[in-house]
A protein has these predicted regions:
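Short, C-terminally biased terminal segments at protein or domain edges
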Residues: 1-52, 56-115
């Protein structure tokens, strides 16, 4: 059952999703539609899966949903690296930094939940 107390990973992923929306809109304004759409899907999915995990039916379900969030984070990192290494894409250093923090927190939660 969901706990309505402050939750670091929920807060981090919500903030990240809002920043991904802004960056995707910036990409679209630069006519980078395909990457914008991919980033929007994977980047907002991280938080959606974290939220789903808060309502998990079991410990195994909780871990499974967080693993899905971690996979989405990995995909998002791929798209951000593509933007970073491609010519004519706006900078996104803050997003990469935010995402690395999220990946670390997810990894710690997953590993500690398995114990």
């Amino acid at each position: 059952m969901r706990n309505d107390q402050p939750n670091l990973i929920v807060d981090l992923t919500l903030k990240f999703a809002l920043n991904i929306i802004d960056y995707s809109e910036l990409l679209e304004s630069n006519k980078k539609y395909v990457i914008a759409r991919q980033l929007l899907k994977s980047g907002t999915s991280i938080g959606a899966n974290v939220r789903e995990a808060q309502n998990a039916e079991s410990k195994a379900d909780f871990i499974h949903k967080l693993k899905i969030a971690a996979k989405e984070a990995d995909e998002t990192e791929y798209w951000l690296i593509l933007c970073e290494k491609s010519k004519n894409y706006p900078l996104n250093d803050n997003l990469t930094t935010e995402l690395k923090s999220i990946i670390k927190v997810l990894s710690k939660i997953i590993s500690s939940s398995k114990k």
